[in-house]
Amino acid sequence: MAQVSMRDMLNAGVHYGHQTRYWNPKMKPFIFGARNGVHVINLEKTLPLFNEALAELTRISSNNGKILFVGTKRAASEAVKAAAVDCQQFYVNHRWLGGMLTNWKTVRQSIKRLKDLETQTQDGTFDKITKKEALMRTRELEKLELSLGGIKDMAGLPDAIFVIGADHEHIAIKEANNLGIPVFAIVDTNSTPDGVNYIIPGNDDATRAIQLYLDAAAAAVKEGRGSNVEAELEATAE
């Protein structure tokens, strides 16, 4: 069972919040106190909440659920992509385009264009057009890949989103709320927990903390996928 320990979180600096003057009062239940003008997050609250979230991620993925990892801050971007790829799930790590979930029909058309352009790079189409046109299409492909590359194979809306930084990704959270998609999110002391179904109070800026969240989430998803494969094999054997 994928779990994290108090020591893991302390070592990663999960307990370091923001300066007290930037706090969101809605995070008061999760704050231990302040030290040198910086809020300290109560890890005795975070630990059970995080492990509960991990158990739910495992359950969702064991039912073939799709998890969308979201983290567009510079500190999180590469780690978000790596974690999603590691557990064969999906990600948005560059910029959240408004309507990515709520206007899925339009997004799907853009994904189709992305895949068409990918095909053109391989089937000789680029050899038959002018260099200028080929360059324009290459730039279009790069732009689409940056925005949609992490969801191009998602084939429909996700069953949950795992967010690094509730404050920074508030548009993604709002869209998920509108569609009834469960939201798992790291919520720092300067953020609101509103709209988050599985609140994980913690530092959303430190790279070590971000890596801890993502490693644990990816492990939970892989565990769920593994149990699903085992169940399918048992059913086949019968």
Swiss-Prot record:
GO terms for molecular function: structural constituent of ribosome. The keyword Disulfide bond does not apply. It comes from the Bacteria. One of its GO terms (biological process) is translation. The keyword Ribonucleoprotein applies. InterPro entries: Ribosomal_uS2, Ribosomal_uS2_bac/mit/plastid, Ribosomal_uS2_CS, Ribosomal_uS2_flav_dom_sf. GO terms for cellular component: cytosolic small ribosomal subunit. Keywords: Ribonucleoprotein, Ribosomal protein. Gene3D superfamilies: Glucose-6-phosphate isomerase like protein, domain 1 (3.40.50.10490), Helix hairpin bin (1.10.287.610). NCBIfam families: rpsB_bact. Belongs to the universal ribosomal protein uS2 family. This is Small ribosomal subunit protein uS2. It comes from Actinobacillus pleuropneumoniae serotype 3 (strain JL03). The lineage of its organism: Bacteria, Pseudomonadati, Pseudomonadota, Gammaproteobacteria, Pasteurellales.
